[in-house]
């Protein structure tokens, strides 16, 4: 009889514990699992930056998940490999929206993948916070679930053209990779270069990745002061390398797609001295980045990639929005719609500075940087010389 009474007392104690301690129940159960997904290229030529986006998100979740766990929920990262391909990104997005536990997406790296994928997210009001997608279309569609912490290519192209004018460039030849991102930023550079009085003597796109002779031979004959490439480092590096090997002496300039230590890993000495604009300043230029870099290196045994810090900030904003949505739901699992509505309300002092979104999901003031490559050693990529830094508001939404 005493044994029965004792067991009864134990049962009552456990029941009371479940009532007074949030998230504690029989068997250590929680109120549920909240997932944050990433979409970025985790395989292929762009996997270095894509992995950096994933790891930035992972570090943010590990460091900042506390308030959501105290509310009784587990928090998990779910990484997806979009392979830098629009069809893969869309297929992944379809899979994401079927998992009701996924409350936010941090991604992508390629705007050409982000734009169609975000249309799928919109069907389920799954919020996307982009660390790296700079094409204006990303936010100019005014989708209620799409936001970004980085800048825009219409501004980046203008910044590049203004810099080229300062270099006394008279003639430029513009090449792009035929992607949504690469062609767009190349067009913005071309148009702004013309306004700045620079003669654009050629504009063409190519999907070639190994033999650029058919493009470079006529360029050598035209002898432009500048070659601008709109695209990603994996294609830009061999283009620039072959240009130098052909004896072309033009200056080189490109956008943030070139911002990777793999540029010098592929291009070596031939890309030393070239210029690039980026919407992701090296983390050393951010006052709050020192601790982030330390924790990143300790955790992953490697340096952060471009957009790792932006991914951390994007994830932090997602976590803040989820926390607010949980409170608004009385401590229950929030809806995706509720999370999406909370994201624009977040004002966050992040690694990359103060972050606040405008009505269409753009950062109210984004950073733009102009750098020069100083070494062929990939380990010294963060030592590249900062030439200019600007904080610029996005253009208003066109009616």
Locate each region found by the language model:
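Extracytosolic ligand-binding ectodomains
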Residues: 2-399
């Amino acid at each position: 009889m005493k044994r029965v009474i004792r067991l009864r007392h134990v049962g009552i104690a456990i029941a009371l514990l479940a009532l007074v301690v949030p998230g504690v129940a029989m068997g250590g159960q929680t109120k549920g699992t909240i997932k944050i997904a990433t979409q970025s290229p985790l395989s292929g030529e762009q996997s270095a930056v894509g992995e950096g986006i994933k790891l930035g998100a992972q570090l943010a979740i590990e460091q900042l998940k506390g308030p959501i766990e105290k509310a009784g929920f587990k928090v998990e990262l779910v990484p997806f490999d979009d392979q830098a391909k629009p069809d893969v990104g869309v297929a992944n997005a379809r899979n994401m929206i079927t998992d009701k536990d996924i409350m936010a997406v941090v991604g992508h790296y390629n705007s050409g993948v982000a734009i169609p994928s975000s249309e799928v997210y919109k069907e389920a009001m799954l919020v996307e916070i982009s660390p790296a997608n700079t094409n204006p279309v990303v936010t100019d569609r005014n989708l209620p679930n799409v936001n970004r912490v980085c800048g825009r290519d219409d501004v980046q192209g203008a910044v590049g053209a203004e810099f080229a004018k300062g270099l006394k460039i008279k003639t430029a030849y513009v090449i792009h990779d035929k992607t949504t991102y690469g062609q767009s930023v190349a067009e913005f550079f071309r148009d702004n270069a013309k306004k700045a009085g620079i003669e654009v003597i050629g504009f063409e796109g190519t999907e070639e990745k190994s033999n650029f002779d058919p493009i470079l031979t006529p360029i050598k004959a035209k002898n432009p002061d500048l070659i601008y490439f709109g695209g990603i480092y994996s294609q830009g590096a061999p283009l620039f390398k072959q240009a130098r090997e052909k004896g072309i002496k033009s200056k080189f300039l490109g956008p943030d797609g070139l911002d990777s230590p793999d540029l010098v890993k592929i291009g070596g000495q031939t890309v030393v001295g070239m210029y690039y604009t980026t919407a992701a300043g090296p983390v050393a230029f951010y006052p709050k980045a020192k601790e982030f870099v330390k924790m990143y290196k300790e955790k992953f045994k490697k340096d952060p990639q471009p957009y790792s810090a932006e991914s951390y900030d994007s994830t932090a904003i997602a976590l803040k929005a989820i926390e607010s949505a949980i409170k608004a739901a009385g401590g229950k699992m929030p809806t995706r719609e509720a999370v999406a509505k909370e994201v624009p309300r977040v004002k966050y002092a992040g690694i990359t500075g103060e972050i606040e979104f405008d009505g269409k999901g753009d950062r109210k003031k984004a950073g733009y940087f102009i750098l020069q490559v100083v070494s062929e050693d990939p380990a010294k990529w963060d030592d590249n010389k900062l030439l200019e830094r600007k904080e610029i508001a996005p253009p208003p939404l066109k009616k």
